[in-house]
Amino acid sequence: MTIYEGTYIGSGLRIAIVVSRWNDLITNRLLEGARDGLLRHGVAADHIDIAWVPGSFELPLVCHRLAESSRYDAIIALGAVIRGATTHHEHVAAAASSGIAQVSLQTGVPCIFGVITTDNIEQAIERAGTKAGNKGFEAATAAIEMATLLQRLNG
């Protein structure tokens, strides 16, 4: 029996992070967590590229373009969608989630969903580095694990 697993050793990997400017109080913290996670696991600082987009709805397009470039072993999408008075947040979250998943499936490059969806700003702050950890850091470790797993699968 063969068991395939990724590792948390990021040396040699090239990672792109795509970050939403909307709710930047939160997304800046997610970005800090993602960069910290990548660096702590051996990804070289000069192998990390960052692209900014207006909002979470725009994440999939830029993730797709970066994945198609063949320059990256994984892409991390970071955003924060917070419930408002209307259902707008549901549409944004659904489009971002579906679009980011399609990037991975269409390009074969892991695109990690680091978009937090919360009911309020307090929950978002908790998920961006306080009580609930930092989802950006978690996305970084998932990116490394998926990139190294695919390298092993590809032989």
Curated annotation (Swiss-Prot):
(2S)-2-hydroxy-3-oxobutyl phosphate binds at residues 85-86, 127. It catalyses: (2S)-2-hydroxy-3-oxobutyl phosphate + 5-amino-6-(D-ribitylamino)uracil = 6,7-dimethyl-8-(1-D-ribityl)lumazine + phosphate + 2 H2O + H(+). The active site is at residue 88. Its EC number is 2.5.1.78. InterPro entries: LS (IPR034964), LS/RS (IPR002180), LS/RS_sf (IPR036467). Pfam families: DMRL_synthase. 5-amino-6-(D-ribitylamino)uracil binds at residues 22, 56-58, 80-82, 113. GO terms for cellular component: cytoplasm; cytosol; riboflavin synthase complex. GO terms for biological process: riboflavin biosynthetic process. The keyword S-adenosyl-L-methionine does not apply. Keywords: Riboflavin biosynthesis, Transferase. Pathway: Cofactor biosynthesis; riboflavin biosynthesis; riboflavin from 2-hydroxy-3-oxobutyl phosphate and 5-amino-6-(D-ribitylamino)uracil: step 1/2. Belongs to the DMRL synthase family. Catalyzes the formation of 6,7-dimethyl-8-ribityllumazine by condensation of 5-amino-6-(D-ribitylamino)uracil with 3,4-dihydroxy-2-butanone 4-phosphate. This is the penultimate step in the biosynthesis of riboflavin. This is 6,7-dimethyl-8-ribityllumazine synthase. It comes from Chloroflexus aurantiacus (strain ATCC 29366 / DSM 635 / J-10-fl).
